[in-house]
């Protein structure tokens, strides 16, 4: 069974975690919520705090070796917190080093900037972080979903059906020879 890590903390955009998690589980994959803290993490939806989700593993209990792919949901607070967590950045970098699929949506690519893995990559994101990605060396496009050698990105919750579909496709393909950290 394929195991997928969904890296998140308090303030993640609820639909950007729930929708991919549900799609992955419907495919028969195990989708673990990985977070810096144990217990529960609280989502953000429609401008307010929303539902809490159980953390399956803490970041210090796992490594990229334990998983087949990584998903990075957005939200404004979630990536802003994760991008300052050294263990989270190492975890993200290791997926790239191992050439495993990585998917990020909305503000999720901010974590990838801090992990220093976007230079030379083609991707999309929420429009407000476009300049940050370009300044970090990425090639940014305003499209619903971009796939760059196992690296899947989307702009916002409206793109989730296409994002989920491409994510599953990349997981089924596995490692990518051209994926680089």
In which residue ranges do the predicted regions lie?
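Extended, subdomain-level signal for the structured scaffold at the beginning of enzyme domains
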Residues: 1-98, 102, 111-122, 130-181
């Amino acid at each position: 069974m394929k195991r997928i890590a969904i890296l998140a903390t308090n303030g993640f955009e609820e639909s950007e975690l729930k929708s991919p998690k549900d799609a992955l589980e419907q495919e028969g994959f195990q989708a673990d919520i990985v977070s810096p803290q144990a217990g529960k993490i609280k989502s953000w939806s429609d401008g307010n705090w929303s539902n809490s989700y159980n953390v399956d593993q803490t970041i210090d209990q796992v490594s990229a070796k334990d998983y087949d792919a990584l998903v990075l949901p957005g939200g404004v607070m979630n990536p802003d917190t994760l991008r300052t967590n050294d263990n989270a950045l190492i975890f993200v970098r290791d997926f790239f080093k191992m050439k495993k699929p990585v998917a990020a949506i909305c503000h999720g690519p901010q974590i990838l900037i801090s992990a220093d893995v976007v230079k030379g990559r083609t991707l999309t994101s929420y429009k407000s972080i476009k300049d940050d990605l370009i300044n970090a060396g990425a090639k940014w496009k305003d499209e619903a979903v971009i796939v760059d050698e196992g690296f899947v990105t989307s702009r916002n919750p409206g793109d989730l059906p296409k994002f989920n579909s491409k994510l599953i496709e990349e997981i089924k393909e596995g490692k990518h020879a051209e994926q680089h950290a």
